[in-house]
Amino acid sequence: MILQQPLERGPPSRDPRATTGVTRGLNASLSPREPLHKQFLSEENMATHFSRLSLHNDHPYCSPPVTFPEALPPLRSPCPELLLWRYPGSLIPEALRLLRLGDTPSPYYPASPAGDIVEL
């Protein structure tokens, strides 16, 4: 069984609706202090719940999506240049060794002269 709302601890209080004769209906709004009843989870209840779900995006289960402003402006003319990159994890111990020796490390990829552009 699942509790819908935690029960309050403390001295018992009288329900003001008990003296006025108001009964709790299915659509009546509940006060935040009033504990809710336990729900019995049966196979039929679960089958009913899952049969109402949909795999398609035609049922709004939550609020409408929020659109955020673009983080970057859209590219006006995309560039077809290729960037070669290697994970530097294996180069870190070598760089530390060279720093201890006082040497300047040579770049792994030699710099290409300006004007050499690789296009796809």
Swiss-Prot record:
Residues 1-30 are annotated as: Disordered. A motif (Nuclear export signal) lies at residues 92-101. It is found in: Cytoplasm; Nucleus. Its main location: cytoplasm. Residues 58-61 are annotated as: Interaction with HCFC1. It comes from the Eukaryota. Residues 20-30 have a biased composition (Polar residues). Keywords: Cytoplasm, Nucleus. GO terms for cellular component: cytoplasm; nucleoplasm. The keyword Nucleus applies. The keyword Signal does not apply. Interacts with HCFC1. Regulates HCFC1 activity by modulating its subcellular localization. Overexpression of HCFC1R1 leads to accumulation of HCFC1 in the cytoplasm. HCFC1R1-mediated export may provide the pool of cytoplasmic HCFC1 required for import of virion-derived VP16 into the nucleus. PANTHER family: HOST CELL FACTOR C1 REGULATOR 1. This is Host cell factor C1 regulator 1.
